[in-house]
Amino acid sequence: EMQRSLVGSEMCIRDRNIAKQDPSFGHPEKFCGNVSKSNWESATVTTSDEKIIDHIKKICKRDPRTGNVVTGGIVSCKDSSWLLSWTINRQGQFKEQKKDEVCVWVYSLFTDVAGDYVKKPMKECTGQEITAEWLYHIGIPVDEIDELAKNHCNTTPTMMPYITAFFMPRRKGDRPDVIPDGCVNFAFLGQFAETPRDTIFTTEYSVRTAMEAVYGLLGVDRGVPEVWGSVYDVRDLL
């Protein structure tokens, strides 16, 4: 995880060095300058314990071992101090996963707040402690939580320091245009470049910026697909 943080920091330094060259190259510090606001943490819990599986069945009304839809989306624990959520996709997810194993994805938006069962912030917790907090919120009896978390789950936590950097507060000009004025062999691609009307956090956004860059720099006479006007489309609004 330290390696992930270092990579993010190095990218931010690189982007800042580029931005120094011209005001039209944006302000990357708006997106990578406050890790306390842009981070959240997730964990993968693997278990085959029948007590835990039974609690999952009660919540989802489905058997997670059938290979069919399980949670059908994200399950949010709205009374969680961490704002903890979890989901189970169709099992098995991995080639080497055993047939009786279930993989649960758990994440939290508030990593700096003490938990309800584990009185520590998520960012300071081990995988076992994160599991204990999750078991508490799915209704496992309190006197069974620690033993189940320690001996019947294998949990891998992952801290993502820049996961919501896309959504940090910004102003016009903080994201550079795909092809800044005057550029003939240089363009910005991806989620931190500015393209009209579209919304970041989608693959389409990144693809659209790449198309704009290639068509614009190479003089390709081809239109970039329009952004779907869902905000004004009654079919979507309904």
Language model segments and positions:
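Conserved flavin/dinucleotide-binding core of flavoenzymes
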Residues: 21-238
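Single conserved hydrophobic/aromatic residue that forms the stacking wall/gate
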Residues: 1-8, 12-15
